[in-house]
Amino acid sequence: MTQTTRVVAGIASVAAGTALAIWSTRDLREAKRTRAPGKHVAAARAFNHGSALLALSVLADSAMEHYRGSFENRAMYLPPVVALCSLGAALHGGADQRAASHRLRHAIQICGAATGATGTAFHLYNVTKRPGGLSWHNLFYGAPAGAPFALVLSGVLGAIAEQLRDEPEHDPQLFGMPAGKALALVAGAGLLGTAAEAALLHFRGSFQHPAMYAPVTIVPVGGALLAHAALAPARHAARASAFARLWLRLTAALGFAGLGFHANGVARAQGGWRNWSQNLFAGPPLPAPPSFSALALAGLAALRMRETER
């Protein structure tokens, strides 16, 4: 891959991320402009979009990593299957404009979150049972403890989207607080969690490329700004939301730019993409960076919802 090709790929990735961030919240912007009903449905659909992107990331990642592990444990077949079901449910929800939840979709997403939580426990057990127990070496080279958590987030976003559809249009509530505020806090916490996993793996890689600092700086700041915008008093709300929205669009673009960087990492390995069957497993994980974009899209939807509440 030549230097020119890499630059073009990076620009295309950033453009794709920005376009997806704007596209995902178009229903919310239209609802706000026309004052039409259904703002909470538009937010629910945006959360479905984020859930779908996370499920796709988990599907690709778990299928590759568990295949590399030769599916030694039969339970290793479960995450790809559940992620595929979650992806289907999220895509169906993203296309559904009805202000009513779907029981099957809701059940699938709850099942996905439960499967992700169980997988996190299994991965932590795998790390602690290795010689040396809980150590940096085992965290680096054992089963990635944060990987199944993406399935938890996908299920949570999808389940919240279904619950939001059943809330009244004039005053939707989640977890005992205004829906926009609750959605922003959930998305912000998800961004901080995914940034922590990226920090661990990039620390393992000794931050050998300056771009490896981006996920551990841009993404946590996005999560903090989102939480601040959710909790800010009314007199500071507009400014906080505007700055957080700008930063979240940058975060969404970063996810796709990271995909380009990881693809470049695979290309630079011995044999490049011609030796894809080995380098895809040995190189940086391609499905990981889009999880930032998924949570940024959810955060943008939450901010739009929060603005209508104020």
Show the residue positions of the predicted features.
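Short amphipathic, positively biased membrane-proximal segments
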Residues: 1-310
